[in-house]
Amino acid sequence: MDTIARVAGVSKATVYAHFGSKEELFAAMVATNCRRIAESLAEETLEGLPVRAALTQIGRQFLTFLLSPDTQAIYRVVVSETPRFPDLGRRFYAAGPQNTRGRIARYLERAAGRGLIRLDDPARATEMFLGMLIGPRHLKRVLGLEPAMSEAGIAAAVDHAVDCFLTLYPTP
């Protein structure tokens, strides 16, 4: 809290007055970061796109976000602080991973309903897609075993995941 107050140019009392506790500060930080990915996956931006283009857009935004230094730092904080603040982990999961999965599953459900892709379980298909995107990349980045991926590296990984996904769940 001292560092945050110093960087913000305010007193520690001001930080506590605004957030109430370290847990609330972490929760606000997590919520702000999670909103960024949710906004980038806004459903209206996906409608009207061919399925391959929509999945590519989702994949690039998701992987870029997930592997960004800010997201990695927040993830590390959440993992390290959740034993002391269990609600932080729950709030992080609800605002981030669960929300993102829900948005993607709803997109896939609508696309399947319009006959644009063949699948019968949008939630399971979403898990498959995200699993192909994440693979070992996230853990390796969190552990510092791999440098940041370039835009070209992200694009190649996403294109491969989309190709594999559309083999499992073809478009007509």
Regions of interest found by a model, annotated:
Residues 27-58, 64-66, 70, 109:
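Amphipathic alpha-helical linker/stalk segments
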Residues 53, 64-65, 69-73, 77-79, ...:
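Amphipathic alpha-helical packing segments from all-alpha helical-bundle domains
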Residues 45, 60-67, 74-83, 164, ...:
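Helix-loop "lid/cap" segments that line or gate small-molecule binding pockets
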Residues 53, 57, 61, 102, ...:
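C-terminal peripheral helix-coil segments that are non-catalytic and often amphipathic
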Residues 22, 29, 33, 55-58, ...:
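Hydrophobic/aromatic residues within well-ordered alpha-helical segments
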Residues 1-24, 28-32:
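Helix-turn-helix
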Residues 3, 23-28, 36, 53, ...:
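Residue-level preference for short helical/loop micro-motifs built around acidic side chains
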